[in-house]
């Protein structure tokens, strides 16, 4: 009788362990196909059955209950830069819904216009919740771009303060030739923080780090960034996480508490990752914030575009992600998930005393348990409940799920 009881206990233990292992296996499930050049997916606060997908050509599409609606939510293709060759960094780049979207119907777009300026504008939804009014555009901010790359473009409302955060790259070309990212009189190479609920078209929050310094732009929240293509806030801790695309050798992830981010200098062009860039040796790192993680830029995007196999390389363009705070994948709780655009690799880690721990290469696991996986990771996204999605630039939206 005792022997049977012991065997039963062992069997139950092994069964439980097997269930736990299976429950911890991650997969991605395709939510919907969307038009190619997909750049971002998001959801307004309180929404449950619709996802909004940003398209570089100038449209925002709606996925409703797994189906992509044929008519775009908004189409401003007549205003965005139209020459979108492979690898182009212009077009419609950012989307954020106002925290009170359900009441005021406001949302914000960041795009590069036909005159090569970055434009951040507010639009309004119509009485039809699936259609916005293109004619309601109110330009909030315009910024001439000296070159056609490193435009940044991401928009996000702070989860705690409700301010609008805007990411801009250094203005492009090789090595930030004008040193914009270290110039506090320039809005390039920085993340801005503005109040769109006060002032016309906006006001500067009283606690912005440079608000009382005349020689510095008061909109700047943090700087020293080459191309912060995607950044995010941990919705639980308010930590700021930035995927900053590198120059030649290193891609980097920055992770700071919100309080430490005020006025933070992330180092570009003095540093690329944790390494001196300009000057190449003996650079002065005083006051610079070093990335918590870096990986080598060793994949050729041009080779990938023409079909050559570069998938064994690590990557060439970091895509910043999110700290998972959803309920469907509890083993991911508190884990930062991010990837690389060129190789489709997806990684995760958590932070302990400023150091990355529990690092995982998720792509083999996802390939094993998923019907298919994204190839060109242009963005990650969250829904209103904190569940995590990934965007394939070629035109598909995937959701992270547990393989059970």
Could you say what each language-model-derived stretch is?
Residues 1-24:
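Bacterial Sec-dependent N-terminal signal peptides
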Residues 23-175, 230-233, 238-246, 250, ...:
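Acidic, Gly/Ser/Thr-rich repeat motifs that build Ca2+-stabilized beta-propeller blades
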Residues 46, 57, 85, 90-92, ...:
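Beta-propeller domain segments
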Residues 29-30, 69-78, 131-141, 203-209, ...:
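Beta-propeller fold detector
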Residues 31, 145, 221, 369-370:
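A conditional alpha-helix N-cap/helix-loop micro-motif detector
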């Amino acid at each position: 009788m005792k022997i049977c009881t012991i065997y039963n206990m062992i069997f139950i233990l092994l069964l439980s362990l097997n269930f736990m292992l299976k429950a911890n296996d991650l997969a991605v499930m395709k939510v919907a196909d969307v038009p190619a050049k997909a750049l971002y997916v998001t959801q307004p606060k309180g929404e449950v059955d619709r996802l909004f997908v940003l398209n570089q050509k100038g449209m925002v599409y709606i996925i409703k209950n797994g189906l992509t609606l044929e008519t775009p939510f908004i189409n401003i293709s007549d205003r965005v830069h139209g020459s979108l060759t492979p690898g182009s960094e212009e077009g419609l780049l950012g989307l954020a819904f106002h925290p009170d979207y359900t009441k005021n119907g406001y949302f914000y777009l960041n795009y590069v216009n036909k005159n090569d300026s970055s434009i951040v504008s507010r639009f309004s939804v119509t009485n039809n919740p699936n259609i916005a009014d293109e004619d309601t555009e109110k330009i909030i901010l315009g910024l001439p771009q000296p070159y056609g790359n490193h435009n940044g473009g991401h928009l996000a409302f702070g989860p705690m303060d409700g301010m609008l955060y805007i990411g801009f790259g250094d203005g492009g070309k090789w090595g930030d030739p004008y040193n914009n990212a270290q110039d506090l009189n320039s809005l390039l190479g920085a993340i801005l923080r503005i109040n769109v609920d006060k002032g016309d078209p906006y006001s500067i929050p009283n606690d912005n780090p440079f608000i009382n310094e005349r020689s510095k732009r008061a909109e700047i929240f943090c700087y020293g960034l080459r191309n912060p293509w995607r950044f995010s806030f941990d919705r639980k801790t308010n930590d700021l996480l930035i995927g900053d695309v590198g120059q030649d050798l290193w891609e980097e992830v920055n992770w700071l508490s919100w309080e430490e981010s005020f006025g933070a200098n992330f180092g570009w062009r003095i540093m690329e990752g944790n390494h001196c860039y300009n000057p190449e040796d003996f650079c002065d790192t005083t006051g610079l914030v070093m990335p918590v993680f870096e990986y080598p830029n060793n994949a050729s995007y041009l080779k990938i575009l023409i079909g050559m196999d570069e998938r064994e390389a690590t990557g060439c363009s970091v895509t910043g992600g999110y700290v998972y705070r959803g309920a469907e994948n509890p083993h991911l709780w508190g884990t930062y998930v991010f990837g690389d655009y060129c190789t489709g690799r997806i990684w995760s880690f958590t932070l302990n005393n400023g150091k990355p721990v529990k690092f995982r290469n998720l792509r083999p696991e996802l390939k094993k348990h998923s019907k298919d996986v994204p190839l060109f990771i242009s963005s990650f996204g969250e829904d209103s409940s904190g569940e995590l999605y990934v965007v394939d630039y070629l035109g598909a939206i995937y959701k992270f799920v547990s393989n059970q």
